[in-house]
Amino acid sequence: MNTLVLLLISIAVLFCGYVFYGSWIARQWGVNEGNRPTPAHTMEDGVDYVPAKAPILMGHHFSSIAGAGPITGPIGAAMFGWLPVTLWVLIGGIFFGGVHDFGALFASIRHQGKSIGEIISLNMSKKAKQLFIIFSYLTLILVVAAFAAIVASTFGATYKDGVLDMAASATKASVAMVSIMFILIAIIFGFAVYRRHTPMVISSILGVGAIVLCMAIGMNFHPFYFSMNTWMVLVGIYITIASVTPVWILLQPRDYLSSFLLYAMLIVAIIGIVGAHPTIDEKVFPAFAGFTINNANGTQFLFPILFTTVACGAISGFHSLVSSGTTSKQLDKESDAKPIAYGGMLLECVLAIITLCAIGYARVTGHTHGATDIFAGGIAAMVAAIPGFEGLKNIMYTLLVLTYSAFCLTSLDTATRLARFMFQEFWLEPGENPKDVKDGFRKLMVNPYFATIITVILGISLGMGGFAKIWGLFGAANQLLAAIGLLAVAAWLGNAGKNNKMFLFPMSFMLLVTICSLSLIVKNQIGIIMAGAAGWGPYAQVIIGSLLVILALILAVEGYRTIAHPRKETEINH
């Protein structure tokens, strides 16, 4: 298969899905009926609830949901071949992930910008909400740990026998320097747009120009050669500040500017694919490698492993937390929900397909050292294969690594803010706001600074202490979040008298996938324990995996009961 043909077919399919299926869903739910004001306006507080222009919010939303997922997911699932991954990305994105993200955002804005947990409480039960929040919070802690470690490893200098390896560390130091300057530019951009009311076009042009200048400076001046552990601490301090800072100061402008890095990355990738249009070599990257694959991690089954590994490239539970956690509090108009949520998911599918194209060429050119090298190396090598572009490989590689790091950093502080919301929400009664709490203990628990500090300490400690030992659970846990998100929105739509049939198969399928995946993980880890070669990781995975299966079953029973017997109550938001 030629990579250009694969990309064009995929874009055409996704475009049709957006125009036809996405529009049908919007009509079924009554999106934008009556021109309702969104929570960003009715509950504006200048910190979390702040209306944002659609391009800025699209930048935040996409940068937050993308992270490393649409790159690492397809790379991990590529062991089964490019065809099954492509089919799942296209089908999953249109009928699963897009519906999930759009539904979560729409449900949240009809519930005053509340999270999926609060929607579960109002439409299912308080017990279901508490279970969901505990599960979501623990999953977010794992996300914070993993992304903090990824960012720190991207920045951290390489030491050999205690001596700094300058040559091996130069690119990392460049990425770190550019990232630091990028944060400062974002703050200036935020003040220019929201306080000085500088026109968006002028601000964007100056912002993009500043990013280019930052890259030029960072590639030639990079004085910070800190170790990975030092960067972990510094990243922890950064996300502590970022998650309690008003969104207009840092989160909105930085994510908006990050979106230009994404567009640059997509343009570079498309130039590489169009210009070089290499054919995928079936010998190194077959269309279909089989239903079972044996590798260093044992026997891998296409079902359910494919559907939990691709993750963000087709559907991801983390997206529902972003949609209902930060995006819904910044949505300016209901009509923006479809392009931002449904369109954002399909754009992520395009990135997943580009990743598949990169894998095929990376395996030919020898870029096989981890997800970052596979993606950046594959795309950069394609660009360098175009006549006249041979000298751009190193520049393109650095740009792509920087973009990858920027996405991880964006997802990291969004995840920290979401975890703070979850921690606070656990202690609140339905409909109660943190400012209303007078009780001493609960007042401490819902304090945003206390909630953030606890979250960061747990996340950074796990990141420094071996999150990889339980990372195997993340794929299944993330997809379980997606199944529960689908379940919650379907329950609300049923209670509100709206069509929820488009949720029934996706949520049932994802529940089946996650329960099977978790059961396989538990079985494999028990085998490791019985073999007598286990540290604490396998024990933790068995315990957590078993609890997640029980949680999935409890929430499934509650959800299906609600869907089967919807309650038309006056407090349900229509």
Write out the residue ranges for each language-model feature.
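Membrane-interface "cap" regions at the ends of multi-pass membrane proteins
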Residues: 16-71, 259, 301, 305
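Membrane-interface helix-loop-helix modules in multi-pass membrane proteins
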Residues: 52-111, 122-126, 143, 148-159, ...
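Membrane-helix boundary/coupling elements in multi-pass transport proteins
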Residues: 68-75, 92-100, 104, 108-112, ...
